[in-house]
Design a protein with these regions (language model features):
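Conserved polymerase palm-domain catalytic core
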Residues: 99, 109-200, 204-219, 224-231, ...
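Active-site-adjacent bridging/hinge elements
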Residues: 49-59, 147-159, 323-326
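An acidic intrinsically disordered interaction segment
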Residues: 31-55, 138-148
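Glycine- and acidic
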Residues: 64-68, 119-120, 161-169, 200, ...
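Short N-terminal amphipathic alpha-helices
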Residues: 52-55, 92-98
Length: 409
């Protein structure tokens, strides 16, 4: 039985290690806020407003987020977490694990190559979802609590700029998974399909039988209000003695076939070109920002941040057990742990860094030769192979300051 109460005890269960990193927050402040928000919900739920929700734009899409400096931020954040928790637990919604998917695809590619691969992308995923279908499902449920329904309705009242789901808010990922269940089931049970994965709007299908795009499109439209992005659709017929390339979840798979059974060395897994370009953009932005502020220590920290893997801890916690303690984790090896041993994409990044540092250009002209040599020591390939980890304590190390100039990268 799921306890759906919006009270202090349930809120505390949803606390994360990173919460103490939030502006003007510590354990005592969060505790006080959670006691306050429990009283607000109990005494006046009908008049509650999500006042910290704001919007920004990225790649011409409207992004919803919570203003961390708003007075009601902690209230809104934990209420949204609890709404999300209740719906996930009751409907058994679980988002796919990217790392598991990547490993599964690699293992499939090593097997007999006689099959079809379908790479599909859904156009304007969150914005095009029929919100009313989800609302009707949840609001007609006798299992979802009245408080959860009321507070979810309050969220939708706050985001009237979009008819779909609010891109950026945590509940949208859960609601979209609930919305896509029928489509997922239809594809999984299609004759010939032996592997299907969808990570948000990115889809990959392996089938021993040919599936027409018309069939896939019809199945999507019968179960949802969505459409495929035709420009990103790729259908591959795997055949012997033929090289194929496709991208999925930030990786690029290059398959070189020379027999009916692929060898491990015939499959190269690299960072996808778009992701490589994104890293290159961050390097350039870091150098341009240095040209303005002349803060070499900050520039070094940015190069370090890009090349290393990092668990993030608070000042009162031990780092040694972060994997089992809900610690935040990020960085190069964590994001791309399934690359091929030759690290071709990482070597290209190292080459890019050397070229931009030691050639005549506007990006590195303000650096001294000794500084350039020091920056060149930060190697993507070496850090990846050694699984180099840097421990960050957010109270003494300004991660936000490091990433500030990459905001629109």
């Amino acid at each position: 039985m799921v306890n759906q109460a919006f009270d202090f005890k349930q809120f505390r269960k949803l606390q994360r290690v990173g919460d103490v990193f939030l502006p003007n927050c510590n354990i005592d402040v969060i505790k006080t806020k959670l006691i306050e928000v429990e009283k607000l919900i109990q005494n006046n739920i009908d008049n509650y407003e999500f006042t910290s929700i704001k919007t920004t734009k990225k790649n011409d899409k409207l992004i919803y987020l919570l203003d961390k400096n708003a007075d009601n931020f902690i209230y809104d954040e934990f209420i949204l977490r609890k709404i999300n928790h209740n719906i996930k637990r009751i409907y058994k919604v679980k988002q796919a694990d990217r790392n598991i998917i990547v490993n599964q695809i690699y293992n499939i590619l090593k097997e007999n190559p006689n099959y079809y691969i379908y790479r599909l992308d859904i156009n304007s995923f969150y914005e095009a979802i029929n919100r009313n279908k989800i609302v009707n499902k949840i609001f007609s449920s006798s299992v979802i609590s009245v408080e959860t329904k009321k507070l979810l309705q309050k969220v939708f009242e706050r985001i009237q700029e979009t008819e779909g789901l609010p891109r950026g808010l945590s509940i949208s990922a859960t609601l979209s998974e609930l919305y896509m269940k029928d489509f997922d089931y239809s594809i999984v049970t299609t004759d010939g399909v032996f592997y299907y994965s969808r990570f948000v709007d990115d889809i990959i299908i392996f089938s021993i039988k040919e599936l027409t795009f018309d069939y896939l499109n019809k199945t999507l439209q019968e179960n949802t209000s969505l459409k495929f992005n035709n420009k990103k659709t790729k259908i591959i017929k795997m055949e012997s003695n033929k090289q194929e390339t496709f991208e999925y979840l930030g990786y690029q798979y290059v398959i070189n076939k020379n027999s009916t059974k692929l060898k491990k060395d015939n499959i190269n897994v690299n960072i996808a070109p778009k992701k490589i370009n994104k890293i290159k953009t961050k390097i350039i932005l870091s150098l341009l920002d240095y040209n303005k502020n002349k803060n070499f220590e900050l520039l070094k920290n940015r190069f370090l941040f890009l090349t290393c893997t990092y668990p993030i801890k608070t000042s009162h916690q031990k780092i040694s057990s972060y994997k089992n303690s809900g610690y935040l984790q990020g960085g190069l090896f964590y994001n791309y742990h399934s690359l091929s041993k030759d690290n071709a994409s990482l070597k290209k990044l190292d080459e890019f860094v050397r070229n931009i540092l030691f050639s005549n250009n506007i990006y590195s002209q303000a650096l001294r030769l000794s500084d350039k040599k020091e920056l060149a020591k930060y190697s993507f390939a070496v850090a990846y192979n050694r699984k180099f980890t840097r421990n960050y304590n957010a109270k003494r190390f300004e991660i936000n300051n490091i990433t500030r100039c990459w905001k629109y990268a």
